[in-house]
């Protein structure tokens, strides 16, 4: 299946006003995780544009450190995903605590980058865009169109870059399993 970039959402949909933002329920981690995953899939192109602008500014000021930081983060992420596929304890951690898994990847990347002296580039060029994405995805309430797009991604009708990353973090399998269970119950 071809990988397609999701459409760029309108600014008034991305930042509609305070009525479409709410604090997540920190007691219900699965509901909060579902909101974050749904928003990451739905607004992925908007997040990509915001991150690209921030990375471009930092990359313009310090291109070598930005490239080095990006390469280190990608290699550490791929290493942790590979290790999680081969070690059961890491796989469970990645599936149950995806935020902690990403934080471990970022901390490991930070320590590697600090050896090369590019800590400020890491903080402003890599960590800040990821933090802003996570905050927006946590606070933004989902709408009906968001939920419909996510179902299409979840059952495999569409494949996007963020969907591939979330699959690597094993954050979409539950949605597919729930949908398959729903269809099998509807047939009975």
UniProtKB/Swiss-Prot annotation:
- Please give the biological process terms from Gene Ontology that the record holds: cellular response to oxidative stress; glutathione metabolic process; intrinsic apoptotic signaling pathway in response to oxidative stress; L-glutamate import across plasma membrane; L-glutamate transmembrane transport; learning or memory; negative regulation of L-glutamate import across plasma membrane; negative regulation of mitochondrial membrane potential
Q: Which Pfam families match?
A: PRA1
Q: Where is this region: Required for homodimer formation and heterodimer formation with ARL6IP1?
A: 103-117
- Regulation: induction: By methyl-beta-cyclodextrin. Up-regulated upon chronic morphine injection, in amygdala only, other brain regions remain unaffected. Induction by morphine may affect glutamate uptake in the amygdala, causing mice to develop morphine tolerance and dependence. Was originally reported to be induced by retinoic acid.
What tissue expression does the UniProt record report for this protein?
Expressed in the cerebral cortex, cerebellum, hippocampus, olfactory bulbs, medulla oblongate and limbic system (at protein level). Ubiquitous.
Q: What is the effect of changing residue 110 to A?
A: Significant decrease in interaction with ARL6IP1 and no influence on SLC1A1/EAAC1-mediated glutamate transport
In the UniProt record, does the keyword Plastid occur?
no
Show the InterPro entries listed in the entry. Prenylated_rab_accept_PRA1 (IPR004895)
Report the main location listed first in the record: endoplasmic reticulum
Which keywords does this Swiss-Prot/TrEMBL entry list?
Answer: Acetylation, Cell membrane, Cytoplasm, Cytoskeleton, Endoplasmic reticulum, Membrane, Transmembrane, Transmembrane helix
The way it spans or sits in the membrane comes to: Multi-pass membrane protein
Residue spans crossing the bilayer: 40-60, 64-84, 93-113, 115-135
Q: Pull the Cytoplasmic topological domain ranges from the record.
A: 1-39, 85-92, 136-188
| Subcellular location(s) of the protein | Endoplasmic reticulum membrane; Cell membrane; Cytoplasm; Cytoplasm, Cytoskeleton
The terms describing its cellular component in GO are:
cytoskeleton; endoplasmic reticulum membrane; plasma membrane; presynaptic cytosol
The N-acetylmethionine modification is found at 1
User: Which parts of this chain are annotated as the region Targeting to endoplasmic reticulum membrane?
Assistant: 136-188
Q: What does this protein do?
A: Regulates intracellular concentrations of taurine and glutamate. Negatively modulates SLC1A1/EAAC1 glutamate transport activity by decreasing its affinity for glutamate in a PKC activity-dependent manner. Plays a role in the retention of SLC1A1/EAAC1 in the endoplasmic reticulum.
Q: How does it assemble?
A: Homodimer. Heterodimer with ARL6IP1. Forms multimers. Interacts with ARL6. Interacts with prenylated RAB1A and RAB3A. Interacts with SLC1A1/EAAC1. Interacts with RTN2 (via first transmembrane domain). Does not interact with VAMP1, VAMP2 or VAMP3.
Recorded protein name is: PRA1 family protein 3
Q: Whose protein is this, by species?
A: Mus musculus (Mouse)
Q: What is the lineage of its organism?
A: Eukaryota, Metazoa, Chordata, Craniata, Vertebrata
């Amino acid at each position: 299946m071809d990988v397609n970039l999701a459409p760029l959402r309108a600014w008034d949909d991305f930042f509609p006003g305070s009525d479409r933002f709410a604090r997540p329920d920190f007691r219900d981690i699965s509901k909060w995780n579902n909101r974050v995953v749904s928003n990451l899939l739905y607004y992925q192109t908007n997040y990509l544009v915001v991150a690209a602008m921030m990375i471009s500014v930092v990359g313009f000021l310090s291109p070598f450190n930005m490239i080095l930081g990006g390469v280190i983060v990608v290699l550490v992420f791929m290493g942790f995903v590979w290790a999680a596929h081969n070690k059961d304890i890491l796989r469970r951690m990645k599936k149950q605590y995806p935020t902690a898994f990403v934080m471990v990847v970022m901390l490991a990347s930070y320590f590697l980058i600090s050896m090369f002296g590019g800590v400020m580039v890491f903080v402003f060029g890599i960590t800040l865009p990821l933090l802003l994405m996570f905050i927006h995805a946590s606070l933004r309430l989902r709408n009906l169109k968001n939920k419909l797009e996510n179902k299409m991604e979840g059952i495999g009708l569409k494949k996007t870059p963020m969907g591939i990353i979330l699959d690597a973090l094993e954050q979409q399998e539950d949605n597919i399993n729930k949908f398959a269970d729903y269809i099998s119950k509807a047939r009975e």
